[in-house]
Amino acid sequence: MNNNLSKLGLGGATFGNVLADGIFGGVNQEKAIEIINYAYESGIKIFDTAPLYGFGRSELWYGRALSGIKRGSINLTSKCGRLIRNVRNKNDSIISDIDIDKGYGEPVFDYSRDGIRRSVEESLARLKTDYLDTLLLHDPDQGGLESEAYQSAFPEMAKMKEEGIVKNVGCGMNECEMPIRFMKKIDLDKILLAGRYTLLENTKSSEFMKICAKKNVKV
């Protein structure tokens, strides 16, 4: 992985998503692809997404936008812990791209070893790539899944890192308390923290940042 790709990255949470209880309607496919292409042409080479974002649409649109770009020139991050299932047919084990585009995707937590691997395999297919630069475990605090994270999710992520399917592993969360516990027990490469860290509000995050520096975990 080339760590000198860019200092800034583009997040894909708004692509196909309805946020803030419907206050923000998200970004459609045409605009999302335009944004991704503009970001790349402007020098941004780090792209972040997740199955949750747009219930599969964010990954799908990233894959379409970046399909003609040399893979080694970009850094792709996605997340695991949720599978996207078809609201119209609960028996479908894999939802089609067509139904994702139509908005029929529904996220379901699954921290089992099989669920984590399937999540990654489905993300790779949507993103049109054979590896991820970074794989983050998504929202174990929201699902009350801390024990499952230790028992099955992180071990499977580590195995995929050994296999070369992912280059770095970590977690993506809103608060710093659980990542602090994670770092004290397991080896992580990166953490995406969506909470606030400013000059005025950093008391809770100070311990977190110190541990990251000590453990050489990128934030």
Predicted regions and their residues:
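Active-site groove signature of glycoside hydrolases
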Residues: 122-144
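Short, acidic/polar
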Residues: 25-39, 109-126, 174-181
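N-terminal binding-site loop/beta-alpha segment at the start of enzyme catalytic domains
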Residues: 1-86
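Active-site mouth loops of central-metabolism enzymes
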Residues: 16-30, 101-117, 144-146
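Short, flexible, mixed-charge acidic loops at enzyme active sites
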Residues: 23-24, 87-99
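Structural preference for beta-strand elements that scaffold enzyme active sites
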Residues: 5-9, 45-46, 73-77, 131-136, ...
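Beta/alpha (TIM)-barrel catalytic core signal, keyed to glycine-rich beta->alpha loops juxtaposed to Asp/Glu
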Residues: 140-219
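Active-site beta-loop-alpha junctions enriched in small/polar residues
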Residues: 13-15, 50-52, 79-83, 137-142, ...
